[in-house]
């Protein structure tokens, strides 16, 4: 985070911060972020972190330019017609949200965990995915990322879709590479090639 702030300052880019996003992001942080964006006249979101941080930023991006309750988008009461631009600095492996127009948020009052798909407005305009930003992650988080990558690949692999031989071979090759590199990254977390 300090590195990103330094780059923004050097480039003369004004910014404001909001922290405290938790895994399985909740609506309270989205409401807080919407208020912050409106008060500070934010024109772009730059979440620095993993999937929960990115999902929260996407929900804020949609809600900041909407006159109603952002939750309207999640329950189908409204459609996202405009949103703040979202760019991403990914600091955890295998989030997935850095390349999609989807977001998942939990409403604490009802414990509803719902997704929103609005790729034309919420897909990040760019994502910085530098492996060096994962070097300081705890080994557990790296292992979770590896398991998550494998799970997503296996979702595609164990399908009943016919005639996907090439896709199956790509999945097998990718899984083989992930398994091989997982051992290296465990021993050398700062190995860029792993």
Give the location of each predicted region.
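ATP/NTP phosphate-donor binding region
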Residues: 1-44
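A short, flexible low-complexity segment enriched in Lys/Arg and Gly/Pro that occurs
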Residues: 23-30, 69-77, 176-194
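Hydrophobic packing residues within well-ordered alpha-helices of enzyme cores
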Residues: 4, 57-60, 178
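Carboxylate- and glycine-rich phosphate/diphosphate-binding segment that chelates Mg2+/Mn2+
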Residues: 102-194
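Residues at the C-termini of beta-strands that transition into short coil/loop
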Residues: 21, 90, 132
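Glycine/threonine-rich beta-strand-loop-alpha-helix active-site module
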Residues: 28-129
């Amino acid at each position: 985070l300090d590195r990103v702030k330094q780059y923004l300052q050097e480039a003369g880019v004004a910014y404001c911060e909001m922290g405290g996003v938790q895994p399985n992001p909740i609506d309270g942080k989205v409401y807080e972020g919407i208020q912050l964006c409106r008060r500070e006249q934010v024109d772009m979101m730059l979440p620095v972190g993993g999937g929960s941080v990115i999902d929260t930023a996407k929900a804020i991006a949609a809600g900041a330019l909407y006159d109603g309750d952002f939750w309207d988008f999640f329950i189908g009461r409204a459609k996202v017609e405009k949103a703040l631009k979202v760019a991403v600095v990914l600091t955890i492996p295998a989030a997935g949200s850095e390349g999609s127009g989807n977001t998942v948020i939990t409403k604490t009052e009802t414990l509803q965990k719902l997704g929103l798909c609005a790729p034309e407005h919420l897909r990040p305009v760019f994502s910085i995915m530098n492996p060096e930003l994962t070097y300081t992650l705890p080994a557990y988080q790296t292992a979770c990322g590896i398991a998550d990558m494998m799970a997503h690949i296996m979702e595609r692999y164990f399908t009943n879709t016919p005639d996907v031989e090439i896709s199956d071979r790509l999945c097998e090759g990718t899984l083989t590479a992930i398994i091989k590199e997982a051992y290296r990254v465990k021993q050398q977390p700062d190995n860029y090639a792993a």
